[in-house]
Design a protein with these regions (language model features):
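C-terminal and inter-domain tail/linker signature
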Residues: 1-129
Length: 129
């Protein structure tokens, strides 16, 4: 399994309450800063955030844009279903830095999309629910 695949699988399992792979691939010194708020988060904070998303967000397919020994960049799509009849869509890019083979920091940026990224593609949201 590549680093990008492990990252994707870890958080998909985490959304189901299984954080064993998250614990395996993250460094004990991991931290992330949300520059919008200035808040520093550790891996336990990230687990709480993922656990509270519930069914309101569906994460679609992701792919590695770059994968090296100490750095990985992953792109992924999300569908936010805050209103049953009015979903919104986004694209995210996550930069992962590694130390001793484990994720020591990450930064995610996202942008809203004004279209459904699954349209005309060989995947659908139901595959990821």
């Amino acid at each position: 399994m590549t680093k990008a695949e492990a990252y994707d699988k870890a958080w998909r399992l985490g959304r189901k309450g299984d954080f064993s792979l998250v614990d395996e691939i993250y460094h004990q010194n991991y931290k992330s800063i949300d520059y919008r708020t200035g808040i520093e988060a550790n891996i336990e904070d990230d687990k709480v955030i993922v656990s509270t998303l519930g069914e309101s967000v569906v994460f679609g397919p992701s792919k590695a844009l770059f994968e090296g020994e100490d750095f990985v960049c992953v792109e992924g799509f999300a569908k936010r279903q805050l209103n049953v009849n009015d979903p919104s869509y986004g694209i995210m890019m996550t930069a992962l830095s590694y130390q001793d083979g484990k994720i020591v920091s990450q930064k995610t940026v996202s942008s809203d999309l004004d279209f459904d990224p699954s349209e005309g593609k060989d995947w659908n949201w139901e595959d990821y629910e």
